[in-house]
Amino acid sequence: MTGFATPEELARRTASAVDAAVAAGRDLGLTVTDPRVLHDLFSPVVARVPVVLPPAETPEALARRQQAELDVAHWLDAQGTPVIPPSPLVPRRPVTRDGFPLTFWQYVEEDRDRVPDYAANSHRTAALHAALRSYPGDLSFLSTADPDSLSASLGLLATRPDLLSPDDVDRARREWQLLEPLVRSRTAFEAAFPGIELQPVHGDCPPANLFHGTAGDLYADFELLTLGPVEWDLATLGPELCAAYDQGAAEAGIRRLDERVLRFADAVGRLRGITALALAPRLPVLVEYLTPLVETWRQTPFAGGVER
């Protein structure tokens, strides 16, 4: 495969992101003595610096997402919901430095000996949904699906058979033709799934984004916060984890997952994962992460069995 970022280019990008975070922190009055990279994939923690963005992402849209993340985390923290909160040492807004968009968060010590229990995390996701129901922020319907980027990514993948075969691209495009109207239009979604309540949801698989701190578990990573069905947050997790969520939902006093909506969320979630391969030239590790998803998707019914 050709056209991938080299290790040297990745190292330079990481170093540039660190430099931007340090400079932005100092501009905001923080004393920075020994910066460390805690995580280097999509979004580092503490000073979160997205370095690889979807093809249709604009600076304005990213700034709105980052502000929404800061706002909901601050609101949840004020309600007593266990979250990683924004840093109280700087203004609660995103900043841009040297072309990098940044947000600042409180440092929380991670329990590195803890093995994630995704069934327990799925169970706890219901409590998060119960807390989010009354969030007053203005959110767009399924904005986290980023349909423009998904369409653009399919176009890019059509030129990269080394990343996704032409047959796979053809199937993905036909699936997206079926699913896209339900993603773009709240009216179309509600007509297809009558009676399904929409609410603020995490947007990015909260069972996989529960932070295990030394003082307890914390909800985190709300950069894809959106208005949608709760099923969106359980997409592609499978029956066992969905059953754990349903148990938590009963305890939290909210509805169980709807099978039809879950099939829709699964189908869109798989397409979003597959089309993330378009980012692989800038983030080569995605090939290793996403190849198993592509292989699983090939064995699933067309569009997850969703019909219109």
Functional labels for PLM-detected ranges:
Residues 27-45:
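ATP-binding glycine-rich phosphate-binding loop
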Residues 204, 208-210:
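Catalytic-loop signature of eukaryotic-like protein kinases
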